């Protein structure tokens, strides 16, 4: 009970969780762990993924650190399991989305590559602030949008490009931007986490959410 995240803690948890997921090899490892049911040691998981054991171990630890994977030690060996830390709402909702994805006969070939751009949209606190600003005020032109989030022009241009590649932005004929609701369950879980952050007093880059409609 006392370990559950507060709204103030949820935003950094969200972008750090997304950062851990925004990697094709890490997504592949997550699928392998799910398929193995926690019965395969790290060395076997690495072999199936075609990764060096130290690299696989590093990636698995990153997923465990964000609460997405559980870890068990048996007979001197390390096993990762599809048991999220339920005290971390983002990890739990993302894990539930992955379970649903894996139950549907398995994701299609190339699923990792297709998921990464959308996940990357949530993997930086400035991009969260930018999406949150559009949720509050849909249809902003880029200049008004940048002014709303107070991000330097060069940085704004970079994050704007990342969001465009993610497919989560829509621009009308006048260049005004709105957030597009994600269609895949993984990005949908991340989006729901962003939208669940209650309004907070603004003391820096805004992390508040809104009930404004999105497309």
Each model region followed by its residue ranges:
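N-terminal helix-turn-helix DNA-binding core of bacterial DNA-binding proteins
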Residues: 13-54, 74-86, 113-151, 178-186
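Alpha-helical residues within the helix-turn-helix
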Residues: 46-47, 64-65, 147, 164-165
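Short, hydrophobic-biased segments on the C-terminal half of alpha helices
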Residues: 60-61, 160-161
């Amino acid at each position: 009970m006392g370990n559950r995240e507060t709204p103030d803690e949820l935003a950094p948890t969200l972008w750090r969780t997304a950062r851990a997921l925004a990697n094709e090899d890490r997504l592949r490892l997550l699928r392998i762990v799910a398929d193995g049911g926690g019965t395969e040691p790290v060395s076997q998981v690495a072999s199936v993924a075609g990764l060096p054991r130290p690299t696989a171990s590093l990636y698995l630890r990153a997923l465990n650190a964000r609460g997405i994977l559980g870890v068990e030690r048996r007979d001197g060996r390390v096993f990762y399991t599809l048991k999220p830390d339920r005290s971390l709402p983002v990890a739990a909702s993302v894990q539930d989305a992955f379970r649903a994805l894996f139950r549907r006969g398995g994701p299609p070939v190339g699923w990792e590559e297709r998921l990464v751009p959308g996940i990357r949209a949530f993997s930086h606190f400035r991009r969260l602030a930018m999406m949150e600003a559009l949720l509050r005020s849909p249809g902003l032109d880029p200049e008004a949008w940048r002014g709303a989030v107070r991000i330097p022009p060069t940085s704004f241009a970079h994050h704007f490009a990342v969001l465009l590649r993610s497919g989560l932005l829509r621009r009308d004929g006048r260049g005004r931007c709105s957030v597009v609701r994600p269609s895949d369950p993984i990005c949908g879980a991340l989006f729901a986490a962003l939208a669940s952050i209650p309004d907070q007093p603004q003391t820096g880059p805004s992390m508040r959410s809104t009930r404004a409609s999105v497309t």
